Amino acid sequence: MKIGFVGLGNVGGKLAGSLIRNNFDVTVREIEECLTNEFKLLGAKVAKSPKELAEQTDLIITSLPSPEVSAEVMESEDGILNGLSENKIWLEMSTTDEDEVKRLGNKVISKKAIPLDGPVSGGCHRAATGNIAIFVGGDRKAFEKILPALTVMGRKVLHTGELGSASVLKVITNYLASVHLVALGEAWTVAKKSNLDLVKTFKGIAVSSGNSFVHETESQVILNGSYNINFTMDLVLKDTGLFDNLAKKLNTPLEISPKIVEIFKDGQKKYGPIAW
């Protein structure tokens, strides 16, 4: 199976790297030429456009920063849609909106190709080691066909149901992680001002009912004096906004979600969109 990979950013680059290391035939496309050159040195082929990439490969993967960018890569004149043909598979690994992935999915189907959504969860550090979780929605047979590729990118792979279901689950998990991160920041502030031993505090939280994946990973970064959790303000606002909009679409009033969006909007205003 020939694999095309569009988007070599924080997560996408690590996923594509796992495929290359495991000897898959990979063609890449990325607007940042320095990243393209890096992957060429690793053994990847380089496509001149998303359309060319889709024409040359069987499984086309997109891992992009926003639904708007995904739409541009798919629908532009030299985009993926114009390079698709019968039985090719498009796997959208970006964090996106359920309605948007279904809209693009219908266009993929019109080309007699097969759409799947396959967002990931677990953070960049896990993506780098092939230890990330992958949720996949869409045709079960197509899912099984690409499973060998999925299992080298992620250790835990879950088929979630119909197209779009994986994107909904991903938005929910990212919302929970964002809430945990905000709560963790407040907890560490109080712990420090209470003059607690922070190493013992870390261990105490880890063995208590207050533990979480976010604590086990991000608290270590915080204790090392860094804010760099490989996730910027603009990305967390995108994710929390997707969850908040989903709740509104479902006519489900929420209390915490709007406050979380407000907190990160304030953070972006103070520190900028690319602050950690």
Predicted segments with their positions:
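NAD(P)+-binding Rossmann beta1-loop-alpha1 motif at the extreme N-terminus of oxidoreductases
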Residues: 1-63, 88, 93
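Interdomain hinge/lid region at the active-site interface
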Residues: 167, 211-272
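Rossmann-like NAD(P)(H) cofactor-binding subdomain of soluble oxidoreductases
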Residues: 52-55, 59-60, 64-132
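Rossmann-fold dinucleotide-binding core
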Residues: 96-175
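Hydrophobic beta-strand scaffold residues
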Residues: 26, 46, 115-116, 157, ...
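Hydrophobic residues within alpha-helices
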Residues: 15-16, 104, 149, 190
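Active-site-proximal catalytic alpha-helix in oxidoreductases
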Residues: 129-137, 158, 162-194, 206-217, ...
